[in-house]
Amino acid sequence: MTTAHRPTFDPARGKEALRGPAYHQRLLPAYTHLKVRQSGQGTEGEAARRDLRAELLQAEAAHFAKKNGAPVPEASAESTPKRQLEGAPANGGDGELEEDPEAKRRRILEETREIDADSEASEEDSSEDESDDEDEAAELMRELEKIKKERLAQKEKEERERAAKEEEQREVDIARGNPLLNPSDFNIKRRWDDDVVFKNQARGTEDKRGKEFVNDLLRSDFHKKFMSKYVR
């Protein structure tokens, strides 16, 4: 991040200039106290008191229950093993807080048995769903093949019809383009400029009538012929 927009706190001075007692804020000591973890922030003692295996089994049971649509079992205080409190004697009056190893083993076996049963049921359901999905996919593929064949047949039919129409039109064009079959095409057509005023002025000058003022288009021969042909 640039600091070009900040004002100069300590401008340059000569060697003989005396410096005052002011210090920049960045030159002051900072972070003089070390932060430590407080209670509830995952200290070593809290990590030692956690039973990670029980938490994992409980999370797996909740997951399979949610997947199978069964009610999620609530976490009970009895299901979580109680560890020895810090500062308590190892063999004292509070020894009953620790769970019996045999009871703990039986509880873990029961939980794992339930989880295995749930997983087997979910596997059976998933296998049935997979078989149904395969049947539906096969049916869809058959329908798709049928639609493709119908479209291909329709396209071939349209191609044949178009080819037949093109062949028929070609034969008609050939027949009409034959001058022997169309004698009317031998008629000589007049040019569009046959009756204009200034066409072939040098031809037939000896047969010209008297001098006429042709620049007046309203009284020219072309205008008269045009009016008599298309207006009258």
Curated annotation (Swiss-Prot):
Keywords carried by this UniProt record: Coiled coil, mRNA processing, mRNA splicing, Nucleus, Spliceosome
Q: Does the keyword Ribonucleoprotein apply?
A: no
Composition bias type Acidic residues, residue spans:
117-138
Show which residues constitute the signal peptide.
none
What does the UniProt entry say about where the protein is found?
Nucleus
Q: Does the keyword Metal-binding apply?
A: no
Which residues, by range, are in coiled-coil regions?
124-176
A biological process term (GO) from this entry:
mRNA splicing, via spliceosome
Q: Which GO terms fall under molecular function for this chain's record?
A: RNA binding
An example Gene Ontology CC term for this record? nucleus
Enumerate composition-biased segments (Basic and acidic residues).
139-174
Disordered: annotated span: 1-21, 63-186
Q: How does it assemble?
A: Associated with the spliceosome.
Q: So what does this one do?
A: Involved in pre-mRNA splicing.
Q: Which family does it belong to?
A: Belongs to the CWC15 family.
Name of the molecule in the record:
Pre-mRNA-splicing factor cwc15
Can you name the source organism?
A: Emericella nidulans (strain FGSC A4 / ATCC 38163 / CBS 112.46 / NRRL 194 / M139) (Aspergillus nidulans)
